[in-house]
Amino acid sequence: NKPDDPNLYHIGSALDVKLHGLLSRISGKQGYFSHLATRNLVKYIEKIKPDVVHLHNLHGNYINLPMLMKYLDDKKVPVVITFHDFWFITGKCMYFTTSNCEKWQEQCGNCPNLQDGNRTWFFDKTEELLKDKTQMFSKTDKLALVGVSKWATDEVCKSPIARYADIVKPIYNWVDISKFYPRDIKKARDKYGINGFMAIGVSSIWSERKGLKSFIELAEKMPEITVVLVGTINEGIELPKNIITVPSTSSIDELAELY
């Protein structure tokens, strides 16, 4: 549904997202479709004439990256990219750590992660995709690359794309201290049956790349502590007895109580 807030713009449609996802899987190229949706977005950007465009996650089957970047480059619009993952600096991977792949630091190809994230059914286009991204961002008039941690920023610096950036720096995820403040710990401990020392992890969906394996190892090595994992976990995964699972929640208050 289109947002009621006039300051928000809804890109494309649900049908376009599904079609983009299908074409991406067939072609092996993510971010090369949604022509009409991107054309309409460009018209909107032309209308509001922003001082800067801030890019976040664009690998959700809804944007044509070459079309968007050509417009921004031609109009010399400054671009900020925040790295919530590493899709912008790889052929297709969001998380290269799962396969310990470092090819993206020079040139992708023969990708070990074709089934990760936006999977491809037939073709490995990662070499072409990274070349395209490098060329696109080399033409950006003013480019800032922002990592959400020091580690992420250090990894971004290893990319060929970083040499075209005017700024590469970390800006850490902020915490709303009006919501996250010391709470009554007894309430949460009683609710979930937590005794003694605890460790907590939060993820919308748990997987190896989100650290699930590390939390399981921690629980096995330290059976005297309680590990609380908030988020969805595959039912087929066997967990140690000292791991407590809490379903995903959109309640800030519930998360704050657990923290």
Region roles according to the model:
Residues 1-52, 245:
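A conserved catalytic-core segment of Leloir-type glycosyltransferases
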Residues 146, 170, 191-210, 216-220:
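Conserved donor-binding/catalytic core segment of Leloir-type glycosyltransferases
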Residues 202-206, 216, 225-240:
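Glycosyltransferase donor-sugar binding loop
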Residues 1-4, 48, 73-78, 141, ...:
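N-terminal subdomain of nucleotide-sugar transferases
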Residues 231-256:
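Nucleotide-activated donor-binding/catalytic signature segment of Leloir-type glycosyltransferases, i.e.
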Residues 148, 171-174, 201-204, 230-232, ...:
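Short hydrophobic "strand-cap" motifs at the C-terminus of beta-strands
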Residues 88, 103-183, 194:
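Donor nucleotide-sugar binding/catalytic pocket of nucleotide-sugar-dependent glycosyltransferases
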Residues 43-63, 78-84:
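Short N-terminal targeting/anchoring amphipathic segment
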